[in-house]
Amino acid sequence: MLRMDTVHRDKDQVVILKKTNYLPYLVNLFIPKLFYPEKIVVARLYLNVNKHDKHAAENFKGTETPCFDVPPSLFSDKVPMDKIVFLPTVMLPMGFEAGGVFGPGVLTRRSYPIDLKAAGHKGQTPPLFIGLLMDIQAPTKVESLLKEVGESQPAQDILMNWVRASNNLINGEQPKEQELRDEFSLSMVFNLPTPPSPPSPYPYGRIPLQFNIYTPDLSNVLLLMSHQRDLTVAILSTINNPHVPSVAFAAMGDEEECPKFELPLSAFPTFEGVNRPIFLPKRFMPKGFEAGCVLKPGALSDLWFMDHIGRFGPTQPQHNGSITPPLFVGKICREEPTVDMIRKIQLEIEKKASEDATLPAVKPKIDISITKGFMVMETAAEDPKPPKGAYSVQSYEEAFDDGCVVKVAKRVATEATDTRGRDEIRTSCDQSQEKDEGSAEADKKHLSCFHVDSDIDNIAMAMARMGVADMSLPAEGEAMPGIDGDRALIQLSHVMEDRNQIRTHTDQLMQDHIFRMNSNRMLALRQPFTCIGCGAQENK
């Protein structure tokens, strides 16, 4: 696409359409920028996409079409200006006040724009579109916003533009091309935000696009209309409203009834085969409708959209812009009260904005304890600083609440505990006295806890500084059913004492495994392998 110098055109400058050898429908032609400082746009067309419309040629032949003076400076060689075919207004892309096309093979290779011609192109030159943009004076704020945001317009902004357009319709600002019809009213689609679905653990391939059937789920869609009729039509989007296979199974199955109605013959043609309308179950229809059907992409012709919807129809993003978009036809339920869709959309936007603004902290209803500690250790009173990798606690209760399951103390404290455990009969006075002594003894000593994922070398180093120390499990046997506490302590002691040997043995096992893998790989490749011990190469 090329942008050239600006030209001036009178509003009443028209020409009679006589030559209709190539007359494409270019409403879906995408121009990648909203506002241009220049007004003339030159774009290459493709015959397989921008096809000749025979019905439009027969319908518009002999009518007046807007035209403009094409400057000869656009081309490097002489061009037959009399062979340009100016398009009717309803066939122009959005944002153009006039435009014409040179058919395939009309322009010579020398006169065709070099930037738009593919390298190594053979055969006749492709068709060319030359359009004159409307004189749009964007506000200063809009121009600065477009420079900051970029060339593409977000989908949400387009959606809000539709909402503003619906407000203009309600206020009585009806465009001339949108006539009030008795058969149906035109609606605009608003998709409510849906929560994201959790990721599936089973990956699956992408469903290929298909146009033999189209059944979207419209239960979360709002339809905005300027005036209410028994029937309403709305242009759908294959991107925002994709095909859902489960809806197709429900529409073709016998599980539930799909309410049906007759489409008026004065407004809709007779559908046959795959183009026939598909009526949706009520749970997949928008709210406020008693029946509804969907016409798949390409079921209606371009002329139908031009005659019944016109250029006012809100554009929707589509996977394929070369065919007509899908259409929803719904029958409004008169029994249900009317819903103020505009107000509902405003409340939805305000709710989302308030949720995004502040997210207050939510306190859990119950206290969920997270395991922090693994081993509680008594350190000497003269060394109040906890060992490396540990943190201090005030009492054994705090350590046990953090999840400590192993207690490490000096041999003297352990023997005293064992002596008290061997006493079979103890009076209540003795128990209270022992409790007071234990609390007083705990006050004189410092308690430190190690995490579950603490470095085992730091734990072993702290135990070595204590001298002769014993490990015990504070929990009783009833709290750990099926666990042999003595055996667990013996295994933990072996891990602490023989950790270097365990690491060396594990490293040797990994080296042996690597050697076997390399040997098997070399044997499979019929190549000599190198011995790890001596470095010599051997053949087997």
Curated annotation (Swiss-Prot):
InterPro entries: DM7. Keywords: Repeat. Residues 416-443 are annotated as: Disordered. Residues 417-443 have a biased composition (Basic and acidic residues). Transmembrane segments: none annotated. Belongs to the DM7 family. This is DM7 family protein GD24576. It comes from Drosophila simulans.
